[in-house]
Amino acid sequence: MKPAADKITLIGAGLNGPLLAILLARRGFAVEIFERRPDMRRVRMSAGRSINLAVSTRGIYALQQAGLWEGMRNIIIPMRGRMMHSIAGELTFQPYGKNEAEVINSISRAELNIALMNAAEEHGATIHFNQRCTGYDLKSGAIRVRNEGTGEETTREAEVVIGCDGSASAIRGEMLRLSRFNFSQQYLDYGYKELTIPAGSHGEHVLETHALHIWPRGNHMLIALPNIDGTFACILFLPFEGTDSFAGLTTQVQVIQFFESRFPDAVPLMPQLANNYLANPTGAMVTIKCSPWHVEGRALLLGDAVHAIVPFFGQGLNCGFEDCTCLLDLLDRHGADWARVFREFENERKVNTDAIADMAIENFTEMRDRVADARFLFRKKVELALEAKYPGFFVPKYAMVTFHRIPYSVALARGKVQELMLAELSESINRIEDIDWGKADRLIRRDLTPLEIRQ
C-alpha cells in the first residue's frame, strides 16, 4: 500500500516532535504525536535531560519558519561569551563572536517544550500523552502503543511514521532488526549532574547575566547558564570513575570539600549544594550514529533518535531543529513523495550530523582544558583578526557552526585548514600587531575559497 500523503504520525513530543508537527500542519498535513511521558503542562516533572539549552542561528531559523521566534524572546537570555572562573576566583570574559550580535541564547528546556506543544496543538496537531510506542510493523504500517497509566496495549494505523523519540528510539529499535542496518553508540567516560545557583535576595542574578560561566579544571568542569527567574542552571561534568569522580563523591562532606578545593567562588552561591548533588541523578552522554535513517517511504528517524551528540558545542537542539527545516524544504520541493524525500534527507544530513558529532567531542576538550590556556586565547584573538581582515574567506569554526547555517561538514573541513593557518601565523608572536599579513594573505588565497554564508 502506498503511504498516505496527508497524515503523519510522530513518535515523541520532546522538542523536535512538536516543532516538526507545526511545520507539517502549516502545510496542510494532519499530525498525531504519541508521547510516553505525561503532559508536563499539567504534571510537575523533570525535563529529563539538561535543564537549559543553547539556541543559536540554526535553531532560531527553524523557530522563525514555525512563526514562533518573536514569541520566544521573553523566555531567553542572550549570552555574549564565556566567563571563565579561575581557581583563584579571577574572572576572564571571552566573547563568542566578532560583535554583540553574535550571541547564543539560554532557554529552559521545559519552557521551550511547553511553548512548542502549545503551538503544535494550536496548529491542529493531536498529542497523545502517556502513550509509549513499543514497536512499529514496517510492513503493515501499524504502531503498537502502551498506555503508561493502565498498561493497556493498542495498535494504531500509521502509514508514515517519523521517530523523534530520542536516543532510546523505539522506531530505531525496529530498524535494528533489518538486514544491513548499521548502528554505533559511544558513551563518554564522563557523566553530568544538574545543580542550581539560586537568585539573589531581590530576584537578581548573582553572577554576570549575559554569559555562560565556566569553571575549567582539566579533567572536570562546572558550567552555569542563566535563567529568566534569576537562577543559574549549573551542570557538573566529572569522570564516572577514578580520582575526582562521581564514584568518589558520595557524602555531603566529600561534596563540599571537593567544591571548596576546585570551585571555591561557586560554593557561597550554592547553599543547597550538597543536598542537590546527592538528590539529583547522574546522567550519561552518548554519541549515536546509524544508517540507513529510513525504510522506503514509510519510516524515518530524526534528531537524537538517529544522531545523538554530546552537548559541548551547544548544537543538540539546533541540529535537531535543522533536521526539521531540511525535511520540510525537501517536502516543499518534491511533495509527498516520501521515499524520495526520506532518501534525500539522509543523503543531505548524515554527513553533517556526523561532522557535528565529532566537533562536539573535540569541543569538550577545548572547554575543559584549553579555554584557560594563554596561547589558546591568543590564537583566538588572531582568529578574530583574520576574520575581520578577510570577511567571507576566514570565518572561525565556532562561528560557522553557531552563527551561520553553513553545513557542519563544511565547518569541520574548513576548520581543520584554518587551524593549520592559525598555528603557522601565531607561532613565535605574542601580539596581534606582529602578525605577518603578507603570509596570511598568501595562505588565505591559496587554501580558502569564498564561503557561502547562510544566516
Where are the model-predicted features located?
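C-terminal helical "tail/cap" subdomain of flavin- and related membrane-associated enzymes
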Residues: K2-D6, D329-Q455
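Residues at the starts of beta-strands that form the adenosine-phosphate
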Residues: K7, A30, L317
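Conserved mid-domain beta->alpha element of the FAD-binding
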Residues: I11-R26, G163, L195, P281-A372, ...
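Conserved Rossmann-like nucleotide-cofactor binding loop
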Residues: N16, D39, A168
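Glycine-rich FAD pyrophosphate-binding loop
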Residues: A25-G48
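Short phosphate-binding/catalytic loops that engage adenosine nucleotides
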Residues: F29, L68, A125
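Active-site-adjacent segment of FAD-dependent monooxygenases/related oxidoreductases
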Residues: R44-A119
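Conserved FAD-binding catalytic core of PHBH/FMO-like flavoproteins
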Residues: N118, E122, Q131-G135, S140-M285, ...
